[in-house]
UniProtKB/Swiss-Prot annotation:
Hydrolase recorded as keyword: yes
Pfam families: GCHY-1
Identification of the protein by name: GTP cyclohydrolase FolE2
Keywords, comma-separated and alphabetical: Hydrolase
Family: Belongs to the GTP cyclohydrolase IV family.
Record organism: Exiguobacterium sp. (strain ATCC BAA-1283 / AT1b)
Catalytic activity line of the entry: GTP + H2O = 7,8-dihydroneopterin 3'-triphosphate + formate + H(+)
Gene: folE2
InterPro entries xrefs: GTP_cyclohydrolase_FolE2, GTP_cyclohydrolase_FolE2/MptA
Pathway participation: Cofactor biosynthesis; 7,8-dihydroneopterin triphosphate biosynthesis; 7,8-dihydroneopterin triphosphate from GTP: step 1/1
């Protein structure tokens, strides 16, 4: 077999061949102290802004859960308000703060996130610090008949704001979990069986800061979703388990409207929850489209 030989130019020559050019001799300052700071130049910029910052920031975190501390990967959105006489914020300070907390080995909890939001506002010299964090939460689930266990996961959310002027923190937590839903209409009109599908439950709950400590909100929201569904999902099912899971769903038919109302009732009874949003979306097994229903409720206004 013959081997051809290619005489390659040097790497620097190859870069030049494909368009690289040498740096020019610059005239602008290279020292930070001598550079123009556009963001902090005071001027009337017409409007104050509710929020400005960065999103889709992936970062490893330790999360405080009733089962113990879990290590996971979270997605952050870090923002602050912006006063009218400033062009922008110093966005590098946002990831600086996140890295500083990571280096200190912090554990994510509602309290530590309030502290984080407060420090954001102080560091950025703005009225309000805001953050949203999302991550997968893992928990153990046993099969309904055999008791065999496996890991399940739900998508968890914290949304926290802290206002420096009022000293008030707002904490909203959320959870997205999948369930089984069985159609009541299909069960009612059919001689046998009924169509069922996977439902996606989204819950967001505003917490009362004075009573949220010690509240196992993940378990509470998970139970509100699953206990009102036709049936929960399971990672491990043997034949006796599958039989029981199917029967449980048949015994508890639910429309999306039913799901939302039943979950809302559970949330209404939780004294730690001051407002909530619930959505149910079913991937209909006999249609191309999804079925959806939602409710937004504030106990302080709507009661």
């Amino acid at each position: 077999m013959s081997t051809s030989h290619v005489a390659l130019p040097t790497k620097a020559e190859r870069h030049k061949l494909f368009g690289s050019v040498p740096p020019i001799k610059g005239t602008k300052p290279t020292e930070k102290e001598q550079m123009v700071d556009l963001q902090n130049t005071p001027k009337n910029f017409l409007f104050a802004l509710d929020s400005v910052g960065i999103s889709n920031v992936k970062h490893p975190v330790n999360v405080e859960t009733p089962e113990g501390v879990q290590s996971t990967v979270a997605t952050f959105e870090l923002t602050t308000s912006l006063v009218q006489d400033r062009k922008g914020i110093n966005m590098s300070r946002l990831t600086e703060q996140l890295d500083a907390y990571h280096q200190q080995g912090w554990t994510v909890s509602n309290r530590s996130l309030i502290e984080f939001a407060q420090e954001l506002a102080e560091r950025m010299e703005q009225t309000e610090g805001q953050l949203t964090i999302r991550y997968p939460w893992f928990f153990t689930r046993k099969a309904p008949a055999t008791g065999l266990s496996g890991l399940m996961n739900a998508d968890v959310m914290h949304r926290v704001t802290y206002n420096l002027e009022t000293g008030v923190a707002n904490v909203t937590v959320g959870l997205v979990i999948n369930v089984t839903t069985l159609c009541p209409c299909s069960k009612e009109i059919s001689e046998y069986s009924a169509h069922n599908q996977r439902g996606y439950i989204t819950i967001e709950a505003g917490l009362d800061e004075t009573s949220m400590d010690g509240f196992d909100w993940r378990a509470a929201l998970l139970d509100a979703a699953e206990s009102n569904a036709s049936a929960p999902l399971h990672p491990v099912l043997k034949r006796p388990d599958e039989k029981r899971a199917t029967e449980i769903a048949y015994e508890n038919p639910r429309f999306v409207e039913d799901m939302v109302r039943l979950i809302a009732a559970d949330l209404y009874e939780m004294k730690q929850v001051v407002n909530f949003f619930v959505e149910c979306r079913n991937e209909e097994s006999i249609h191309q489209h999804d079925a959806i229903a939602s409710i937004t409720f504030d106990k302080r206004q709507d009661a």
